[in-house]
């Protein structure tokens, strides 16, 4: 699992997590989760 951090258009920090096949990703709003 690879994980990278980007900022979205509003400047919020977003964690992009690729799943096992590496095609899809889950975006997590870090401001909401902690």
Curated annotation (Swiss-Prot):
GO CC annotation, single: extracellular region
Superkingdom, natural source: Eukaryota
Annotated segments matching region Disordered: 1-34
Biased composition regions of type Basic residues, renumbered to the chain: 14-23
Regions of compositional bias (Basic and acidic residues) in chain numbering: 24-34
Chain ranges passing through the membrane: none
Compartments, record wording: Secreted
Expression sites (tissue/organ): Expressed by the venom gland.
Principal place of residence: secreted
Keywords: Secreted
Assigned protein family: Belongs to the non-disulfide-bridged peptide (NDBP) superfamily.
Protein name (database record): Non-cysteinic peptide Bs 10
Naturally occurring in which organism (per UniProt): Hottentotta tamulus sindicus
């Amino acid at each position: 699992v690879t994980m990278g951090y980007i900022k979205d258009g509003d400047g919020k920090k977003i964690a992009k997590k690729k799943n096992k096949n590496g095609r899809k990703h889950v975006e997590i709003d870090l401001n909401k989760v902690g």
